């Protein structure tokens, strides 16, 4: 079994993270998932969540990751998502306002895309939870 994973996190705007890690914990549509070195090959869909990264040095990092795709093969882990942010990049006030708007839309379902409003709520909650 290999000692480390090669992790790459990509968004349309940037290469968010690239490095050797011991562990990654995130949320897939099937539930919480922990990826360790030697993990079996897998492709899964990710939910908006706070993702925990344990670097080779043992340093723990947390980041907001939006819905996306995770692929693990040959100890190379790739996460592709629309948005990825470090805690210092998140505007708490903006996230709380987005949460409030999404909750209002869901309460008055007339003429809205419920799935889109629910995804917006999930993104806002994940950002808020990461900062608390």
Swiss-Prot record:
Signal peptide: none
Main location: membrane
Keyword field contains Protein biosynthesis: no
Recorded GO CC terms: plasma membrane; proton-transporting ATP synthase complex
Record bears the keyword Cell membrane: yes
GO molecular function, one term: proton-transporting ATP synthase activity, rotational mechanism
SUPFAM superfamilies listed in its UniProt record: Epsilon subunit of F1F0-ATP synthase C-terminal domain, Epsilon subunit of F1F0-ATP synthase N-terminal domain
Keywords assigned: ATP synthesis, Cell membrane, CF(1), Hydrogen ion transport, Ion transport, Membrane, Transport
CDD domains named in the record: F1-ATPase_delta
Membrane topology listed for this record: Peripheral membrane protein
Pfam (any one): ATP-synt_DE_N
Subcellular location: Cell membrane
Family: Belongs to the ATPase epsilon chain family.
Record PANTHER family: ATP SYNTHASE DELTA/EPSILON CHAIN, ATP SYNTHASE EPSILON CHAIN, CHLOROPLASTIC
Subunit: F-type ATPases have 2 components, CF(1) - the catalytic core - and CF(0) - the membrane proton channel. CF(1) has five subunits: alpha(3), beta(3), gamma(1), delta(1), epsilon(1). CF(0) has three main subunits: a, b and c.
NCBIfam families in the cross-refs: ATP_synt_epsi, PRK13450.1
Protein's job: Produces ATP from ADP in the presence of a proton gradient across the membrane.
Identification of the protein by name: ATP synthase epsilon chain
Organism the protein comes from: Clostridium kluyveri (strain ATCC 8527 / DSM 555 / NBRC 12016 / NCIMB 10680 / K1)
Lineage start: Bacteria, Bacillati, Bacillota, Clostridia, Eubacteriales
Gene: atpC
